[in-house]
From Swiss-Prot:
CDD domains named among the record's database cross-references: YajQ_like
UniProt cross-references to NCBIfam families, sorted A to Z: PRK05412.1 (NF003819)
Protein family membership: Belongs to the YajQ family.
Lineage: Bacteria, Pseudomonadati, Pseudomonadota, Betaproteobacteria, Burkholderiales
A GO CC term assigned to this protein in UniProt: cytosol
Short name of one Pfam family: DUF520
Highest taxon above the source species: Bacteria
UniProt organism field: Ralstonia nicotianae (strain ATCC BAA-1114 / GMI1000)
Keywords of the record: Nucleotide-binding
Name recorded for this polypeptide: Nucleotide-binding protein RSc2549
Amino acid sequence: MPSFDVVCEANMVELKNAVEQANKEISTRFDFKGSDARVEHKDQELTLFGDDDFKLGQVKDVLLTKLAKRGVDVRFLDYQDKQKIGGDKMKQVVKIKKGVSGELSKKIVKLIKDSKIKVQGSIQGDAVRVSGAKRDDLQAVIAMLRKDVTDTPLDFNNFRD
């Protein structure tokens, strides 16, 4: 019985490459000369640093550009509040979303049941397993989920036949 998993996880290798490219551009840009602007990556979060609110926004723009070029969906990023860290310096923590939330997984299973396609959806931790008799049905479910779930980036992996 063919099946696949619906997950929500960023490509961490590409994310790391985008952060390194952003830091390289920030270090060479004229408008950041002598500033302490940078992006730090640790586990499941990024930290943006800037000399003031405007420079922090510029760092964010550079990072988003590099992420888009590397093919990392920016919907994985969850921006926290900006914080002052002494003087005029600012920082902003950006959490990286991982796993399908309980609410979203229930929504995905409900969408699958309402679609009347002959497949079953089951919640398994932070993923949703979809299994059906035909591969064509699974492809129809993937197309339907890509169309209907737009607020969260979904990946489809662990295909079994």
